[in-house]
Amino acid sequence: MKKITFILLLIASVFAGNYQEIRINDTSKEVIHRLQDLGVDLDHVQQKKGEFIQFAIPENIASLLSEDGIEFIVIHDDLESFYASRLYNISSRNFDYGSMGGYYTHDEVVEHLVELSEDYPNVVSELQFLGESYEGRPIYAVKLSDNPNIDEDEPEVLYTGLHHAREPMSYMNLFYYMYWLVENYGSDTEATALLNNREMWFIPMVNPDGLVYNEGINSNGGGMQRKNHRETCSSNDDQYDWDGIDLNRNYSYQWAFDNDGSSPDPCSQTYRGTTPFSEPETQIVKNFVESHDFPIVLNYHSYGNLLIHPLGYIAGLLPPEPDLSVFREFGNEMTEYNNYLMGTGIETVGYTVNGEACDWMYGVHDIYAYTPEIGTWDDGFW
């Protein structure tokens, strides 16, 4: 199948107080554990084993690193400004970008879903309301198929985007793919075969509240809210980050397995919540998945040019055979042309996660679930 890549030319890292991008020339396990103990989000780390790690960090947390004796070099002192300047250049190009530095705002996401449904009713279903987010915003799904409003006996696949609010590349990629499918239906052999023989479901915006918060931070893009927007962090001294639950640590499979793969700290970027599925957003995904028969799911994130598969909650643990061979075979096919690094979290980004969506989908429902992390290290989140 043709691999559709959506390259938006984006950027590298974060915002809160001020976000910086720093490099630490020490990759030892001791340093990694010290960073985790200080609440550093290591989800997206550029690294060269044995030489350095490079990542985004709030300025106030960087101060804690200094106090702890961890030496680092500042690569970008103000990432929000860095992002905004690059996104401004992108948004001036002659392309159907959104108004948020080239990305769609929350309202534009909904508008484009409505547009797809109304303009291509022969292959795009009516919007399906799945439920409301913590702050009461609707979360929608849409199906692309040759009989979109009929439940046919065809294989289903699910694509999700924006579990993390600072990763809008995830839903932009899905919209690009949806538009490619509908615009080429009837003229392109592969697009036509897919829509004639599959039921392709899309939930492009799992975390609408976080996205709206980022719009408020910077309407031109670059906001670094990651989590949803539940009030969790009672600290007002700017020692940590924002309120919210990390939705991709809130699923039930191996939830709270340890404090490295997720955090019990309500102010942490990887805060897992008080219980599994405590959040309406993850409950919505759970209910939707359990009402369908998905053999495969792709939960889109950014960044890293990676394709990650379970299991992720403990280092070195692989799915049993024959599942491992299936994960590897599908993964190799999906990365044949884009050259993404494929494997488990440890094999790709070098960290563990627990309470994560793909682990839950595979561990509980035997779904071959993958996390495409799209965009290069230089692209970053925005």
Each model region followed by its residue ranges:
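Sec-dependent N-terminal signal peptides
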Residues: K3-S13
